[in-house]
């Protein structure tokens, strides 16, 4: 994906960059694969904030993505590469021979007119989907299942991928970009290749207003709050924290404390923890 940079003609344009959308082939999505989606603004079903700094932004229609890739042995043809406002990756519209249309995550190198297929007989080719046990060691994959039939959960954002490094009995070992090495059942599915739009992380929004369009609200420092809002708040002028260590907004130590549950069931399937 190419990045378009702006000249500093205004303060908002200084250092600003956007995607050139050179891979996008249409601006009209498939209407039958759109559903209404109400923004929850970071609230759960009780109305409590569970994710801070969310709210507002432009309205979006949700695109129904095929994460399961369970349409076996039916060839599909790539009709379009489209922008998806709900994720960092682009999506591809697939026309199958039986007449059905589905969206999939667009991997790097996928172009209009290419043919893809799912199933154990599929070739090791970009955008084809197979069980992990049928994919050679060393292959890069994305959209990886953690439970057979549940749909892909790992490596779904722009530029992400995993590499198959070995097999152990009924398990396959993957190397994530973080350096973590988990064991995944060999019957779980994965898609060949890495997600496209890899330059997404280089985008500079330039001004706060563009972040607000995306539904991202300001992040306020704890030291700028009142003491009833944050443990760092209060004091006269620029006061120090006043505690032995930095705290989260909920009063827990913020640095140097491991946050993963020691009794989590998936701990037994992680061979090496992440390194970054």
Curated annotation (Swiss-Prot):
Alphabetized UniProt keyword annotations: Ribonucleoprotein, Ribosomal protein, RNA-binding, rRNA-binding
Pfam families for the chain: Ribosomal_L2, Ribosomal_L2_C
Disulfide bonds: none
Any one GO BP annotation for this protein: cytoplasmic translation
One cellular-component annotation, GO: large ribosomal subunit
Database matches in PROSITE patterns: RIBOSOMAL_L2
Molecular functions (GO terms): rRNA binding; structural constituent of ribosome; transferase activity
rRNA-binding found in the keyword field: yes
Gene3D superfamilies linked: 2.30.30.30, Nucleic acid-binding proteins, Ribosomal protein L2, domain 3
Biased composition range(s): Basic residues: 252-276
Region called Disordered, residue ranges: 221-276
Record family assignment: Belongs to the universal ribosomal protein uL2 family.
Subunit note: Part of the 50S ribosomal subunit. Forms a bridge to the 30S subunit in the 70S ribosome.
Role summary: One of the primary rRNA binding proteins. Required for association of the 30S and 50S subunits to form the 70S ribosome, for tRNA binding and peptide bond formation. It has been suggested to have peptidyltransferase activity; this is somewhat controversial. Makes several contacts with the 16S rRNA in the 70S ribosome.
Name the UniProt record assigns to this protein: Large ribosomal subunit protein uL2
Organism whose genome encodes this protein: Aster yellows phytoplasma
């Amino acid at each position: 994906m190419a990045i378009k940079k702006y000249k500093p003609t205004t303060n908002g344009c200084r250092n600003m960059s956007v995607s050139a959308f050179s891979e996008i082939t249409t601006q009209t999505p498939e209407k039958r694969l759109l559903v209404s989606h109400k923004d929850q603004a970071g609230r759960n079903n009780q109305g409590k904030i569970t994710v801070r700094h969310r709210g507002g932004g432009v309205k979006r229609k949700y695109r129904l993505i095929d994460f399961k890739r369970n349409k076996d042995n039916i060839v599909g043809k790539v009709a379009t590469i489209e922008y998806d406002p709900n994720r960092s990756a682009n999506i591809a519209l697939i026309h199958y021979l039986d007449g059905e249309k589905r969206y999939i995550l667009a991997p790097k190198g996928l172009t209009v007119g290419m043919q893809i297929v799912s199933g154990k007989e599929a070739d090791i080719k970009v955008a084809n989907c197979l069980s992990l046990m049928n994919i050679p060691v060393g292959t890069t994959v994305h959209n990886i299942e953690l439970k057979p039939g549940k749909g892909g959960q790992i490596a779904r954002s722009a530029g992400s991928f995993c590499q198959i490094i070995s097999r152990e009995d009924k398990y396959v070992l993957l190397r994530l970009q973080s350096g973590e090495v988990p064991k995944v059942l060999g019957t779980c599915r994965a898609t060949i290749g890495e997600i496209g739009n890899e330059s997404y992380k280089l985008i500079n929004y330039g001004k706060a207003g563009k972040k607000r369009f995306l539904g991202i609200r300001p992040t306020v420092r704890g030291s700028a709050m009142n003491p009833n809002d944050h443990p760092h708040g209060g004091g006269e002028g620029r006061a120090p924290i006043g505690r032995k260590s930095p705290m989260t907004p909920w009063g827990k130590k913020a640095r140097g404390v491991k946050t993963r549950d020691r009794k989590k069931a998936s701990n037994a399937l992680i061979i090496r923890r992440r390194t970054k």
